[in-house]
């Protein structure tokens, strides 16, 4: 059996998140989907898996809502559903950053496409000749599986630690074009908004994150795999899963608890 795995997020005003959560839960359960959906006033964040027809029908229904018409979904395949359950949760944020002064609903973070970034990586600088620094917004557990060659990484275990950890390196970034990246784009979007609000106007987000980069241009300039928070453990640049029984067993225990 071929399972379609999806990742998507969208910052958009949702005034009644619980109502939407109930609707998504009903449609997802009927379709037999597995995974997690997070909903907040600021938007939606989805990691879902299922058979092709079920996935296509679900996203066709969701994107018929004008609020989600621009939702960009990233796809990969596996031989099994990498999630044990189907969960829909209402949260204060769709990715926890705990910076109330940062709102993607008010302004979007400027970004760079995968194809443009690949060109910059080949040259080692942006289109204006300014040196390029890749800034990983993920935690150390994720980074251990892979990151962009020569990327700056931070000693954090949670995304909320990003601002404090970055403070020690600000001077090193002042003369560079900084491209922040994460798994699918949601964390680096908030990170870039905060950095720009904090006076760093030379920062961009990688549109679509690492998975979008893999999907569009492959693994050029990237060392290793991209960690994902499910039973696939990590994906290579061809979006193929790594199957590690020890990590899968650990994940299964956390799903049950």
UniProtKB/Swiss-Prot annotation:
Instruction: Show the catalytic activity.
Output: uridine(34) in tRNA + AH2 + O2 = 5-hydroxyuridine(34) in tRNA + A + H2O
| Organism annotation | Xylella fastidiosa (strain Temecula1 / ATCC 700964)
Where are the active-site residues found? Answer: 182 (cysteine persulfide intermediate)
UniProt-recorded Gene Ontology molecular function terms: oxidoreductase activity, acting on paired donors, with incorporation or reduction of molecular oxygen
Keywords in UniProt for this one?
Answer: Oxidoreductase, tRNA processing
Question: Which stretches make up the Rhodanese domain?
Answer: 128-222
**Keyword match Electron transport:** no
**Function, please?**
Catalyzes oxygen-dependent 5-hydroxyuridine (ho5U) modification at position 34 in tRNAs.
First-level EC class: oxidoreductase
Concerning Pfam families, the annotation shows: Rhodanese, UPF0176_N
Q: Which SMART domains match?
A: RHOD
According to its UniProt entry, one GO biological process term is: tRNA modification
For this protein, the record's Gene3D superfamilies field holds: 3.30.70.100, Rhodanese-like domain (3.40.250.10)
Q: What is its EC number?
A: 1.14.-.-
Q: At the top level of its lineage, which domain of life is listed? A: Bacteria
The family database entries (HAMAP family) matched by this protein are listed as: TrhO (MF_00469)
Gene that this polypeptide is encoded by: trhO
Kindly provide the name given to this protein in its UniProt entry: tRNA uridine(34) hydroxylase
Q: Which cysteines are joined by disulfide bonds?
A: none
Regarding protein family, the annotation reads:
Belongs to the TrhO family.
């Amino acid at each position: 059996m071929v399972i379609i795995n999806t990742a998507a997020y969208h910052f958009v005003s949702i005034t009644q998140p619980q109502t939407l959560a109930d609707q998504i839960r009903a449609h997802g359960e009927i379709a037999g989907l597995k995974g997690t959906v997070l909903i907040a006033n600021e938007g939606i964040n989805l990691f879902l898996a299922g058979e092709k027809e079920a996935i296509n029908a679900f996203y066709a229904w969701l994107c018929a809502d004008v609020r989600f018409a621009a939702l960009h979904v990233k796809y990969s395949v596996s031989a099994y559903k990498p999630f044990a359950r189907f969960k829909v949760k209402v949260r204060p944020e769709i990715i926890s950053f705990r910076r109330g002064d940062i709102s993607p609903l008010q302004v979007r973070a400027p970004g760079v496409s995968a194809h443009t970034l690949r060109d910059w990586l080949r040259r080692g600088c942006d289109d204006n000749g300014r040196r390029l620094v890749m800034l990983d917004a993920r935690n150390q557990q994720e980074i251990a599986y892979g990151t962009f060659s020569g990327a700056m990484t931070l000693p954090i275990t949670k995304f909320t630690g990003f601002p404090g950890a970055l403070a020690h390196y600000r001077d090193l970034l002042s003369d560079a074009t900084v491209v922040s990246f994460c798994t699918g784009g949601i964390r680096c979007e908030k990170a870039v908004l905060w950095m720009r609000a904090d006076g760093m106007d030379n920062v961009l987000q990688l549109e679509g994150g690492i998975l979008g980069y893999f999907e569009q241009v492959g693994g050029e300039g990237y060392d290793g795999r991209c960690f994902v928070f499910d039973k696939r453990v990590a994906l290579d640049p061809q979006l193929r899963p790594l199957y590690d029984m020890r990590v899968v067993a650990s994940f299964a225990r956390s799903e049950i608890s």
